[in-house]
């Protein structure tokens, strides 16, 4: 029986979340959202858009809450090119699964490093305004896997809020540098869910 790539990814992520839940510390205790800015990638005679909206969460893997699994999804603004002959619209979506480690803590600032996997989906919609019969651009879509490597800072702003800033490089067929800023909300008090 043949299985699609998306089905394999779904099974892998489901198994990872189930395994994380077996550990008594593997609980989601914070969620973040914000903006992502990418150096972009060329696709189908166009580029990808900025900024992106990112949503992510953290699963603590140890009692000290220094090691986390961090899944995230990002949807980027569309890139639109109008030439008078045609309109090209490119969309980019990314899913990441990173392992994050706290390098050190100084007061209310935490330095973190992370690495993991990335899946990028690109979709390009071509709309001809004037048909010549010799169009070299058409509708196109692509799916690529890659790896992330990055670092960042977590800044404590309030008892249940953090501000995070991070940068990473994505190694893939569509390699790019990505900077992200997020507001992070903690579901529980930090005394029980998160140590500083």
Where are the language model's segments positioned?
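Bacterial N-terminal signal peptides
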Residues: 10-20
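Short glycine/proline- and aromatic-enriched beta-strand/turn motifs that initiate or cap beta-hairpins
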Residues: 22-68, 178-190, 196
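Predominantly the C-terminal beta-signal and adjacent terminal strand-loop region
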Residues: 69-70, 76-79, 147, 152-196
